[in-house]
Amino acid sequence: MSHLDNGFRSLTLQRFPATDDVNPLQAWEAADEYLLQQLDDTEIRGPVLILNDAFGALSCALAEHKPYSIGDSYISELATRENLRLNGIDESSVKFLDSTADYPQQPGVVLIKVPKTLALLEQQLRALRKVVTSDTRIIAGAKARDIHTSTLELFEKVLGPTTTTLAWKKARLINCTFNEPPLADAPQTVSWKLEGTDWTIHNHANVFSRTGLDIGARFFMQHLPENLEGEIVDLGCGNGVIGLTLLDKNPQAKVVFVDESPMAVASSRLNVETNMPEALDRCEFMINNALSGVEPFRFNAVLCNPPFHQQHALTDNVAWEMFHHARRCLKINGELYIVANRHLDYFHKLKKIFGNCTTIATNNKFVVLKAVKLGRRR
């Protein structure tokens, strides 16, 4: 846990998933402080919109103003709810919207934590363009190293005149005034042909490797299991290309597409609808934090290309949670398959959790591993 003192309220905040690391990562950053310093209770008029509030620092601080928390991360929503509870703040104080929803009209203040991907930022700025006015105060923040010329140009292109502040504690702010500059329409998704298939893959703004198949998934697809039955999970499904391939290779199986990103799950659904509509009755789509709340001993196999970062921070906390959830939800003799960068040494992590691990394939960058849930059902 970490403490954030600001002009609105003193907060105790924790990351989600929680970690027991000796030196845990902090649940807020200097950009959060810097953003809050720009505001005064007396000048906040109209709806307050907060975009990409990773662990709820801004939402908790401004809870008295009933803000809207907007983003593409279910984990961030869970983190914000947990930190509201931790600080004795009514959860209903914050309204949660995903980035594809309609934003509230005529907001008085918009606070944006600059996301990792320009594509998501552009989608969000275009959504804001429909609702902000020239009187809306628009401020974005991030680590100084994460604000580039391209970031500022995007604000200028979509919303209007943009300036940036001096750095403070290695954070920087962007101030923007809306003047409705001319702007061409843009498609909601980016599409590309998947090599070796007849499929066209569609990707919403925040999907990993949006403009083509990432090399880890390409390697994984060469080693996916075939002719399985029962239920298979594509955990952290992204655009669903792994799940699509599983549907094709395992015609007797049902595939459950799971991701914490609403845009990823929407992309997966769209890709099944457009490429294998006949398989829709063998699919389930789930926005979730890994497999939280899913009954144990349910699945025959789980396949996963786990992330090794959370927002801008490098961490294996999310992957570790995915592995534990997979073990809990697998049937006896059910199998977990993962692909990962070799340097992450997931072999020993899986062996610690499952008691076994087998290397299926390896190249100079990636490894495909399999772990089996052994033992009797208790």
From Swiss-Prot:
PANTHER family: RIBOSOMAL RNA LARGE SUBUNIT METHYLTRANSFERASE G, RIBOSOMAL RNA SMALL SUBUNIT METHYLTRANSFERASE C. InterPro entries: DNA_methylase_N6_adenine_CS (IPR002052), rRNA_m2G-MeTrfase_RlmG (IPR017237), RsmC/RlmG (IPR046977), SAM-dependent_MTases_sf (IPR029063), Small_mtfrase_dom (IPR007848). Belongs to the methyltransferase superfamily. RlmG family. It comes from the Bacteria. Gene3D superfamilies: Vaccinia Virus protein VP39 (3.40.50.150). The keyword rRNA processing applies. It holds the Pfam family MTS. Its EC number is 2.1.1.174. Keywords: Cytoplasm, Methyltransferase, rRNA processing, S-adenosyl-L-methionine, Transferase. Specifically methylates the guanine in position 1835 (m2G1835) of 23S rRNA. GO terms for molecular function: 23S rRNA (guanine(1835)-N(2))-methyltransferase activity; nucleic acid binding. CDD domains: AdoMet_MTases. Its main location: cytoplasm. It comes from Shigella dysenteriae serotype 1 (strain Sd197). GO terms for cellular component: cytoplasm. It is found in: Cytoplasm. It catalyses: guanosine(1835) in 23S rRNA + S-adenosyl-L-methionine = N(2)-methylguanosine(1835) in 23S rRNA + S-adenosyl-L-homocysteine + H(+). This is Ribosomal RNA large subunit methyltransferase G.
